[in-house]
Amino acid sequence: MDKKSARIRRATRARRKLKELGATRLVVHRTPRHIYAQVIAPNGSEVLVAASTVEKAITEQLKYTGNKDAAAAVGKAVAERALEKGIKVVSFDRSGFQYHGRVQALADAAREAGLQF
């Protein structure tokens, strides 16, 4: 089993558990150059809010898009957008990535901006 398939297996197991809970989830995806965050409806069929380092509004404030500062900016942006739509409580779906580095920076920034998870 290679690294990617192990991550996908971990993500599938976590998503199955989150689906049982029926909670709105904050999903994170990480690539070497960018980080993406989406708030997805409990049924899994609708993206309610999204933010990423690909967006021009976020990228203009950053020097580089693949570091912890960029992840924190995305976390803050997705939390602010979720709060505008009335979403206050989410479940954190790290997509099988370790809760460390950029994933942790995004989560901490989202919590500081007012999201609860």
Swiss-Prot record:
Keywords: Ribonucleoprotein, Ribosomal protein, RNA-binding, rRNA-binding
Top-rank lineage group of the source organism: Bacteria
A Gene Ontology BP annotation from the UniProt entry: translation
Pfam families membership: Ribosomal_L18p (PF00861)
InterPro entries: Ribosomal_uL18_bac-type, Ribosomal_uL18_bac/euk
CC annotations in GO: cytosolic large ribosomal subunit
CDD domains: Ribosomal_L18_L5e
Main function: This is one of the proteins that bind and probably mediate the attachment of the 5S RNA into the large ribosomal subunit, where it forms part of the central protuberance.
Subunit relationships: Part of the 50S ribosomal subunit; part of the 5S rRNA/L5/L18/L25 subcomplex. Contacts the 5S and 23S rRNAs.
Protein name from the UniProt record: Large ribosomal subunit protein uL18
Species the sequence originates in: Enterobacter sp. (strain 638)
Gene symbol of the encoding locus: rplR
